[in-house]
A protein has these predicted regions:
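Conserved class I S-adenosyl-L-methionine
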Residues: 70-94
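Core SAM-dependent methyltransferase catalytic element
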Residues: 137-157
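A short acidic, Gly/Pro-enriched loop at the edge of an enzyme's catalytic core
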Residues: 29-42
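Short alpha-helix
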Residues: 104-127
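A short SAM/SAH-binding and catalytic strip from SAM-dependent methyltransferases
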Residues: 41-53
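Acceptor-substrate binding/catalytic loop of class I
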Residues: 75, 92-112
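Class I SAM-dependent methyltransferase SAM/SAH-binding core
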Residues: 1-31
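A short glycine-rich, Lys/Arg-flanked "PGG" loop and its adjoining helix->strand segment in the class I
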Residues: 55-70
Length: 157
């Protein structure tokens, strides 16, 4: 992560749970210079819809992964239902997120992610929806990818 504050929170969580995890305050492009094609798993969660060039970030994540490695992305689909739930619902009605957190135009359809991933040497293996239950504050995997979704891709050898 690029945020020192979030790195500190993650380190605190790891220490409290007696986990041995190395956290780095870095962006993907800087990390490529030091550790290109060195990771078995690369996760990029809830970030693609916030960057100016998602295809560039997908390419960077692929560059960090070893051949045969897994790369995971989560994002928000771009359609009216996603707008209603992720922006109107989460930001304005339920106030789960600050207003303006999301820009509908930056939401990414799974087909767009898959297309950019193919160009980056990644093959889409599985796509799952993620559903948030506001009353129980729990998440569940679902077949419905109309709002939040998780993509599992594998780097070609």
């Amino acid at each position: 992560d690029k945020s020192d504050v979030l790195i500190e929170l993650a380190q605190k969580h790891a220490k409290e749970n007696q986990l041995t995890i190395e956290y780095l305050a870095s962006d993907a492009e800087s990390l490529i210079k030091r550790q290109s094609q060195s990771f078995d798993i690369v996760c990029c969660m809830e970030l693609l819809e916030h960057v100016p060039d998602p295809s560039s970030l997908i390419q960077a994540c692929s560059a960090l992964a070893k051949p045969g490695a897994w790369v995971f992305f989560s994002s928000i689909n771009r359609n009216p239902r996603a707008y209603l739930l992720a922006i109107i619902g989460a930001e304005y009605l339920l106030k789960l997120l600050p207003r303006g957190t999301h820009d509908y135009k930056k939401f990414i359809r799974p087909s767009e992610l898959a297309s950019s991933a193919r160009l980056a040497g990644l093959t889409l293996k599985q796509l799952q929806g993620i559903h948030y239950h506001p009353l129980t504050q729990n998440y569940a995997l679902t077949e419905d990818i109309s709002v939040n979704y998780l993509a599992a891709l594998q780097k070609r050898s």
